[in-house]
From Swiss-Prot:
Cytoplasmic compartment spans: 2-28
Catalytic activity: Cleavage of hydrophobic, N-terminal signal or leader sequences from secreted and periplasmic proteins
InterPro entries (UniProt xref): LexA/Signal_pep-like_sf, Pept_S26A_signal_pept_1_CS, Pept_S26A_signal_pept_1_Ser-AS, Peptidase_S24_S26A/B/C, Peptidase_S26, Peptidase_S26B
Keyword Acyltransferase: no
GO BP, sorted A to Z: signal peptide processing
Gene Ontology terms: cellular component: endoplasmic reticulum membrane; signal peptidase complex
Protein name: Signal peptidase complex catalytic subunit SEC11C
Subunit and interaction comment: Component of the signal peptidase complex paralog C (SPC-C) composed of a catalytic subunit SEC11C and three accessory subunits SPCS1, SPCS2 and SPCS3. Within the complex, interacts with SPCS2 and SPCS3. The complex induces a local thinning of the ER membrane which is used to measure the length of the signal peptide (SP) h-region of protein substrates. This ensures the selectivity of the complex towards h-regions shorter than 18-20 amino acids.
Amino acid sequence: MVRAGAVGTHLPASGLDIFGDLRKMNKRQLYYQVLNFAMIVSSALMIWKGLIVLTGSESPIVVVLSGSMEPAFHRGDLLFLTNFREDPIRAGEIVVFKVEGRDIPIVHRVIKVHEKDNGDIKFLTKGDNNEVDDRGLYKEGQNWLEKKDVVGRARGFLPYVGMVTIIMNDYPKFKYALLAVMGAYVLLKRES
C-alpha cells in the first residue's frame, strides 16, 4: 500500500480534487511547490525585462490583432520588435505605434517620411490591406507620427502563434480555466 505524501509517489485523484491534493501534502512539499511556482513567474519576468533591454522596445513581442496588414501579416501572427533610437525610420518599414487615447498599439507600414531641416522626422503610416492612410486613427489634429510614438519595428515573426492570446482575450473564461490548470499543475506536480 502506498501512503499519500510519500516521496516519489502520486495517488491519482478522483476528478480534480485540487484542494484535497493540497491537504495531502506536508508543509515542506507545499512550501517547495509555492517557491517553485514563484521561481517560474520571476524567471518569466526577468526574461521579459531582459528582452526589453536587449531590443530597446517597451514591448518586444506583440500580436497582430486585425487583418489590416494582410498579406504581409495575418491576425494572430507574433511579431518581434526592436526600437533603437539611433536607427532612422524609413518608408516601407513596418512599425508598431501607440496613439494617444488608445490602449492597443497598431501595426502598420510607413508610407511617407517627412524630414525637416532641423532634423525632426515625421512619418505617415497605412495598413497594407486598408484603402486610406492612418490619419483618421491618429489623435485629433495630428497628421504625422513622430519617433516618440513608435513602440518598435518588426524584425521577425511567427505565423499564427499569437492566436492563443487572441482566444484568451476573446474568451475570458477559457483564459482563467487555462491559468487555473497551469497553476494547479505547478503546485501539485511532485518531484520523483
